[in-house]
């Protein structure tokens, strides 16, 4: 099984996979819980998540904006939102003395953020961290501009949303820091990225966002696990994943951690380009750092992972 751009869906799929003993290759899921307290033996995740995003972007924000800042959060009301906000706020508080002055929580699918933005505008915050996902992220960012919150406050996207810059425009993404799984200009650095981006561009007529990279790599890694297992029997495939073989990806060498089935992989930091600096209509971001994954990760049992049985 595969699918999910919502971590709530990913967690539900984890439970279904374990119950039915069917392998689940996670789609997009940024919650700490997916390979934390809600991990299962039958689930594997390729992409980065709240804790690694926070530990990657945190030092960048402290260097760019300094210590002892006041921060506001916009948080979607489900597992992804709460865990990304928790990891980000805790890192910035512990390492930089940043203070969360307001955390505006909104339901999934909200279209009107006026109440949240009024509270944020009156909070005294200097930095706005928008954790909203998908269309919610687009609408809340656009409305933050309309309310004058942006550019009064620095905007940060602690967990980058595919197609966000395309939808809000370079005028809003300019200067914004974000952590991400992948950006297509990495084709200039990694051979596998170059192969994938060129093939994707030829077939679809535009450059891939990280959701496409995530899907491709997830199934390439599944195929590798099946090949080394010598068949499709799920317990054998799982044990093949758990061997921790070093694999090549679009961001360098990676491997799965056997204790929680989380891929140990770099996190990419990007910053939005000025419109005049863009070399094409999709050239929204500059890759500023590629940060090794292992030092960003919590200990395997820190978030309560207990994988369960093979059969």
Report each predicted region and the residues it spans.
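Extracytoplasmic ligand/sensor domains, especially the bilobed periplasmic-binding protein
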Residues: 1-103, 152-178
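Surface-exposed patches in mature extracellular/periplasmic domains of secreted proteins
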Residues: 3-4, 70-76, 207-214, 233-237, ...
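Hydrophobic alpha-helical
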Residues: 7-18, 112, 118, 125-147, ...
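Sec-exported extracytoplasmic/periplasmic mature domains
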Residues: 14-22, 62-67, 89-97, 118-125, ...
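Extracellular/periplasmic periplasmic-binding protein-like sensory domains
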Residues: 40, 141-216, 227-233, 237-238, ...
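Catalytic-loop motifs flanking and including active-site residues across diverse enzymes
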Residues: 53, 57, 84, 136, ...
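Structural motif
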Residues: 53-57, 105-120
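Solvent-exposed, acidic/polar segments of extracytosolic/periplasmic ligand-binding ectodomains
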Residues: 174, 243-311
């Amino acid at each position: 099984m595969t699918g999910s751009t919502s971590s709530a869906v990913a967690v539900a799929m984890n439970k279904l996979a374990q119950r039915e003993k069917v392998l689940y290759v996670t789609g997009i899921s940024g919650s700490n819980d997916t390979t934390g307290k809600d991990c299962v033996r039958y689930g594997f995740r390729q992409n980065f998540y709240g804790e690694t995003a926070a530990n990657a972007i945190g030092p960048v924000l402290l260097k760019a904006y300094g210590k002892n800042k006041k921060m506001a959060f916009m948080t979607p009301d489900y597992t992804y939102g709460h865990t990304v906000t928790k990891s980000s706020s805790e890192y910035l508080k512990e390492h930089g003395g940043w203070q969360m002055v307001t955390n505006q929580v909104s339901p999934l699918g909200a279209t009107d953020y006026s109440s949240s933005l009024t509270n944020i505008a009156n909070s005294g915050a200097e930095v706005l961290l928008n954790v909203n996902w998908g269309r919610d992220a687009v609408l809340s960012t656009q409305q933050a501009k309309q309310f004058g919150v942006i550019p009064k406050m620095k905007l940060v996207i602690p967990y980058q949303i595919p197609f966000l810059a395309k939808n809000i425009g370079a005028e809003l993404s300019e200067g914004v820091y974000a952590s991400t799984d992948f950006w297509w200009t990495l084709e200039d650095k990694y051979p596998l990225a170059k192969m994938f981006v060129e093939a994707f561009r030829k077939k679809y007529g535009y450059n891939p966002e990280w959701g496409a990279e995530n899907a491709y790599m997830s199934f390439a890694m599944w195929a590798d696990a099946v090949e080394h297992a010598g068949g499709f029997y799920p317990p054998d495939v799982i044990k093949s994943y758990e061997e921790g073989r070093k694999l090549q990806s679009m961001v360098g060498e990676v491997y799965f951690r056997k204790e929680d089935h989380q891929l140990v992989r770099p996190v990419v930091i990007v910053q939005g380009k000025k419109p005049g600096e863009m070399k094409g209509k999709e050239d929204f971001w500059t890759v500023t750092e590629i940060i090794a994954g292992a030092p960003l990760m919590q200990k395997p049992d820190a978030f309560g992972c207990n994988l369960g049985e093979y059969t």
